[in-house]
Amino acid sequence: MHKIVLLRHGESLWNQQKLFTGWTDVDLTEFGREQAREAGQKLKAAGLVFDLGFTSYLKRTKLTMELTLQAMGVDIPWRADWRLNERHYGNLQGLNKEQTAEQFGAEQVQLWRRSYDVRPPEISEDNQYNQKNDPKYQGIVVPSAESLADVVVRVVPFWQEVIEPLLRNNQRIIIVASGNSLRALIKYLDQMTPKEIIELEIPTGQPLIYELDDQLQPIKHYYL
């Protein structure tokens, strides 16, 4: 049997302010930092040990990883992969969710947020939150906007190409990512329908343990 831990980053500044975040690189709140430390304490108390970790390119996931491992009292190698980034929210990035609903209508915003294959408006070239010229994404085709279906298309190959071989080699892994990249991964693992996955809520800072059989099929999962 194999175990892998999935952890959504702690509360970010824009989570707190109810802004669309996407690929915008925002920090954790103090509460988010405490969530990361508490996650580490829970993992330590559960006796979980890791050989390797993965985060997205976004600092809210990196800082969550650092604080979680510090709270566990361990120092393991971990690396970032852009395919674990949050869903790109296009021109909605940086906008207040309630004000956006007032501007475009609550039904339209809900469609952008919670449908499986509908993309929000593409980010404009002059938008201050456009990452296309960010040097850390050099060589990567940065999306202009993504649906959850688009996130699945990039997350599943990451799992198949990177994580599966490591698990088969009995590596113990922790992944710190964002709500929608974890939704995409869970959809694949649990073979969920689009309707099921868009209704799934993943809390910040709560370790989610997946137990997998020798074929890497889920046996069960649970939060600590």
What residues fall within each predicted segment?
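Phosphate-coordination/substrate-recognition cap region in phosphate-metabolizing enzymes
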Residues: 40-128, 187-211, 215
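Short, hydrophobic/glycine-enriched beta-strand segments
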Residues: 3-9
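Amphipathic, non-transmembrane alpha-helical scaffold segments
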Residues: 29, 33, 54, 58, ...
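Glycine-rich phosphate/pyrophosphate-binding loop
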Residues: 121-147
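ANL superfamily AMP-binding
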Residues: 32-48, 158-164
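Active-site-adjacent alpha-helix immediately C-terminal to a catalytic or transition-state-stabilizing loop
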Residues: 4, 62, 70, 75, ...
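Glycine-rich N-terminal loop/short-helix segment of MobA-like nucleotidyltransferase
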Residues: 11-26
